């Protein structure tokens, strides 16, 4: 038990009761004069003037004066007009704080019979005493601390009557007193009650007062014939358990002593006389204890506690570990002159009693049995936290695997989404992978040149998928591969989140996606180098058909997904020109570079655009790049004001859809052209006639060509330009011809008009039978190309054939060829976007 030691003294207050009607009738002079709140004068001198007509009775009417004009100083003096609340505020209200801190407290009222002790302690209806007020205040403070601490309140109520102890709450026979080394003075058999509220406690106090012994005497009509002791025990502890938990136990004693009386004044006889004698004996023992404690002044001396049962019960309250308040009740009348004087004398003597206060705090260190329970709780908490941490780490690993970044792949334009090439069933993925392996062998022998045509076709394929009533989003391209001017962007995986069970399927889709990208790049490289054979074209078309079927199924599930809109099937790439609104964007220098370098080799008819004129957007500044050191022949493009372009013959191309082309290192024609990258052969492999449509260049510096005369006949036919002396077609004049730069002077270079005009490459006429276009692709022999090219080629037998036949979709007839006898089937070598 840990105790905080504190020195204190007994606090003494004096209360002067009002005069009774009997005292007023006797016209006795008062012997008490209250000077201030702390001082009073006993038996003051009579004033010479006095009151006119008022004469005090002589000495024969009262006792002689003793200690005339005596002054007493106390901690507090209450006059005749003081209320019960005033007495409570300066007595028990102040010591309640110490009581809740674990200090024992005691309040007792001392005085002669009829001085107002019981009225001060118990009060009456409508004017409760200190016991009632203290109980209410105690419960109010306990409720204020209820959230922090747990409280347990016990009460007991006993009386000492004729030197016998009786229980007032449960009346029974006399009880004995025992000394306990730890608890001090105890009364075995005394009942303790635990009230649930302050009202219940007051009800118990009222019931005990009714059991108390009272008899009227001549001095007091309601004289108490016993000493009453009301005790309150409070045990409190913190609500949060722990090793530092402390248990506080305190006791408060509210004592109403019986008044000393004189037999001559009370005229007591028989039982009342014996009661009075026992009361006086116990009070005498109390006075002796007070004198012994006052004379000791901290020294060890004998204190006669055993002279009376009252002093034994009050051992802790008066001279022990307790904060004590003594209320001295006196009468102002001279009828009680001797009793008042004795009360003031003993009260003044009690002020000299010094006390040693100790706070009763029981440390939790002594409760070893709680350690095992606390250890079990801590172990359970550690196990729970470890399990929670493992679950968190497992979830983090799964999320990291799910959101792992894709490996570096080939650069593709932003307009192409990776989700458009994702295969569906596993059988199709295996077929695509087999085709891509053979194409990889061809790519290694060709290098990494001529990527411009690939991007042009991809842009055209993207424009097909956009619905006519909506505008396809245009994104700014960014260069990705060094040495390649083609704008590209890294492919992004699907935005959908997959569960861990679908990781295997996602891995297969990603693998198939990489294979399709490789095949796409292979096709563009072969096409740009003019190394495609009919067998290769057939295999690539078969591969494109598989992707088309998967895109159609995937589009049916989520038609509004932006990623599906980028999957461009082959059939839509050759849609009718009548369904397109034409290319309305400006022809940039980058577009002219691509077409200037590619159309000399292959004239690739690009797919028409499916967007309307209302959805065109202005080109971004990123489209106009600066000249690189690899293009010394390029001249700076003139600054042209932004304006709305006329309908171009390339409806599949929107603004920003044509990426930059790979520059060539060797001239493909005798005319002045841009340099291209090295190629195994300087000659172009002649093939069947391929007609192409390219946009109008902004100036001759960009197209490196001179204007030609417009043809006056329909051009939607098949021409053979491999003859020795091809005829030079005539051209009609354009409406916007004055907008073309005057630098277009030479007539021996290809020209990019703004109206539908076809540009053809020169070559010798192939000796092939006049059959349909699809039959020509299948029956063409590699020897025809080998006779006119020095580039090493792989024989068509080394390429793996598709598992199923593929039919090249035929484009619809153009309105310009309705009066022509020939059909578009005569066109061969048409390139489709992949």
Curated annotation (Swiss-Prot):
Entry annotated with the keyword Cytoplasm: yes
Region of interest called Disordered, as start-end residue ranges on this chain: 400-508, 602-642, 655-686, 800-834
Residue runs in coiled coils: 368-404
Biased composition (Polar residues): 462-474
Modified positions (Phosphoserine) in chain numbering: 484, 634, 657, 814
Binding site for ATP: 111-118
Entries under InterPro entries matching the protein: Kinesin-like_fam, Kinesin_motor_CS, Kinesin_motor_dom, Kinesin_motor_dom_sf, P-loop_NTPase
Domain Kinesin motor span(s) in chain numbering: 9-353
Cellular compartment(s): Nucleus; Cytoplasm; Cytoplasm, Cytoskeleton
Function of the protein: In complex with KIF2C, constitutes the major microtubule plus-end depolymerizing activity in mitotic cells. Its major role may be to transport KIF2C and/or MAPRE1 along microtubules.
Protein name according to UniProt: Kinesin-like protein KIF18B
Organism expressing this protein natively: Mus musculus
Lineage, uppermost ranks: Eukaryota, Metazoa, Chordata, Craniata, Vertebrata
């Amino acid at each position: 038990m840990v105790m905080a030691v504190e020195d204190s003294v007994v606090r003494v207050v004096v209360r002067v009761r009002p005069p009774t009607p009997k005292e007023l009738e006797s016209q006795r002079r008062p012997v008490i004069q209250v000077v201030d709140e702390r001082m009073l004068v006993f038996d003051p001198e009579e004033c010479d003037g006095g009151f006119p007509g008022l004469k005090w009775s002589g000495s024969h009417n009262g006792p002689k004066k003793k200690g005339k004009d005596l002054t007493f100083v106390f901690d507090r003096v209450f006059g005749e007009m003081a209320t019960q609340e005033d007495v409570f505020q300066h007595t028990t209200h102040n010591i309640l704080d110490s009581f809740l801190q674990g200090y024992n407290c005691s309040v007792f009222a001392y005085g002669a019979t009829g001085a107002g002790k019981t009225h001060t302690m118990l009060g009456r209806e409508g004017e409760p005493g200190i016991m009632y007020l203290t109980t209410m205040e105690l419960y109010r403070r306990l409720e204020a601390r209820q959230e922090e601490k747990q409280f347990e309140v016990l009460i007991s109520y006993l009386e000492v009557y004729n030197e016998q102890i009786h229980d007032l709450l449960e009346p029974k026979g006399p009880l004995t007193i025992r000394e306990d080394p730890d608890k001090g003075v105890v009364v075995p058999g005394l009942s303790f009650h635990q009230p649930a509220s302050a009202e219940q406690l007051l009800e118990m106090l009222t019931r005990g007062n009714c059991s108390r012994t009272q008899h009227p005497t001549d001095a007091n009509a309601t004289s108490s014939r016993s000493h009453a002791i009301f005790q309150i025990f409070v045990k409190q502890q913190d609500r949060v358990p722990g090793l530092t938990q402390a248990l506080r136990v305190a006791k408060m004693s509210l004592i109403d002593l019986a008044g000393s009386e004189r037999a001559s004044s009370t005229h007591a006889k028989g039982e009342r006389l014996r009661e009075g004698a026992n009361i006086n004996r116990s009070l005498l023992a109390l006075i002796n204890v007070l004198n012994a404690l006052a004379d000791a002044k901290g020294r060890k001396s004998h204190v006669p506690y055993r002279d009376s049962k009252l002093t034994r019960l009050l051992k802790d309250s008066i001279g022990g570990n307790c904060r004590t308040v003594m209320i001295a009740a006196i009468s102002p009348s001279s009828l009680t002159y001797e009793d008042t004087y004795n009360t003031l004398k003993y009260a003044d003597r009690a002020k000299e009693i010094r006390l040693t206060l100790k706070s009763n705090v029981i440390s939790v260190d002594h409760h070893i049995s709680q350690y095992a329970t606390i250890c079990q709780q801590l172990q359970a908490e550690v196990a729970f936290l470890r399990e929670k941490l493992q679950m968190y780490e497992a979830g983090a690993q799964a999320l990291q695997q799910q959101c792992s970044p894709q490996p570096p792949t080939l650069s593709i334009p932003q307009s192409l989404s990776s989700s458009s090439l994702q295969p569906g069933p596993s059988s199709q993925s295996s077929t695509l992978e087999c085709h891509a392996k053979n194409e990889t062998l061809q790519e290694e022998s060709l290098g990494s040149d001529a990527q411009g045509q690939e991007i042009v076709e991809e842009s055209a394929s993207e424009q097909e998928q956009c619905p006519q009533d909506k505008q396809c989003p245009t994104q700014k391209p960014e260069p990705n591969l060094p040495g390649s001017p083609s704008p590209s962007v890294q492919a992004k995986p699907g935005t959908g989140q997959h569960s861990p069970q679908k990781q295997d399927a996602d891995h297969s889709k990603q693998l198939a996606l990489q294979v399709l990208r490789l095949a796409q790049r292979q096709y563009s490289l072969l096409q740009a180098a003019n190394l495609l054979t009919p067998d290769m074209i057939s295999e690539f078309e078969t591969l494109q058909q598989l992707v088309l079927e998967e895109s159609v199924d995937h589009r049916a599930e989520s038609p509004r997904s932006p990623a599906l809109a980028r999957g461009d099937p082959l059939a839509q790439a050759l849609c009718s020109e009548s369904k397109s609104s034409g290319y309305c964007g400006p022809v940039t220098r980058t577009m002219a570079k691509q077409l200037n370098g590619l159309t000399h080799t292959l004239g690739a008819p690009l797919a028409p655009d499916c967007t309307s004129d209302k959805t065109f957007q202005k080109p971004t500044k990123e489209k106009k790049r600066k000249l690189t050191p690899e293009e010394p022949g390029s001249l700076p493009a003139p600054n042209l004001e932004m304006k709305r372009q006329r309908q171009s013959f390339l409806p599949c191309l929107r603004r920003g859809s044509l990426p930059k082309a790979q520059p060539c290192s060797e001239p493909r024609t005798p005319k002045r052209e841009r340099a291209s990258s090295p190629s195994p052969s300087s000659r172009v492999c002649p093939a069947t006639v391929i007609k192409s449509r390219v946009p109008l260049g902004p100036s001759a510096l960009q197209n490196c060509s001179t204007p030609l005369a417009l043809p006056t006949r329909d051009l939607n036919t098949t021409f053979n330009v491999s003859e020795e002396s091809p005829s030079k077609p005539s051209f009609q004049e354009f409406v916007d011809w004055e907008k073309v730069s005057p630098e277009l002077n030479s007539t021996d270079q290809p020209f990019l008009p703004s109206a539908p005009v076809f540009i053809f490459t020169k070559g010798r006429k192939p000796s092939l039978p006049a059959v349909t276009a699809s039959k020509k692709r299948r029956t063409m022999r590699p020897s025809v190309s080998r006779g006119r090219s020095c580039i090493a080629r792989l024989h068509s037998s080394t390429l793996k054939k598709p598992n199923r036949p593929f039919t090249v979709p035929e484009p619809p007839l153009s309105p310009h060829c309705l009066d022509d006898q020939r059909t578009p089937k005569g066109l061969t070598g048409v390139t489709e976007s992949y």
